Amino acid sequence: MILKILAKKHVKDVLKLLNSKDMYFSELQKTLNLHPKILDSILSDLVNEGFVEKREGESPYKFGKVYYSITPRGKRALEILDLIETFDTLREGQDIVINYKIVNSTA
């Protein structure tokens, strides 16, 4: 399920924008020029998988603006998407060296 979500069109663009700053729905929609239903679907998937957090900001109106922010898990997903993009640009004879370590952050 995670790979299916990350492979969706515009997911990387959303994560990149949220990596630079928290944004509300209409900011994302205007910046990406996406239909609201498409953006809502992408954001719902990202929130459900823990890549993005959703919170309601203060507002004098009945409905406040909903802000979205990238989570640490979302930042790691963005790094993986960047790595995949780099892998796609490799030429014959080139290789990627990856150093990684899995740590238990609850210890």
From Swiss-Prot:
UniProt KW Transcription regulation keyword: yes
This protein's UniProt keywords: DNA-binding, Transcription, Transcription regulation
Keyword Cell membrane: no
CDD domains registered for this protein in UniProt: HTH_ARSR (cd00090)
Pfam family for this entry, one: HTH_45
Gene Ontology molecular function, alphabetical: DNA binding
Protein name according to UniProt: Uncharacterized HTH-type transcriptional regulator MJ0361
Source organism (scientific name): Methanocaldococcus jannaschii (strain ATCC 43067 / DSM 2661 / JAL-1 / JCM 10045 / NBRC 100440)
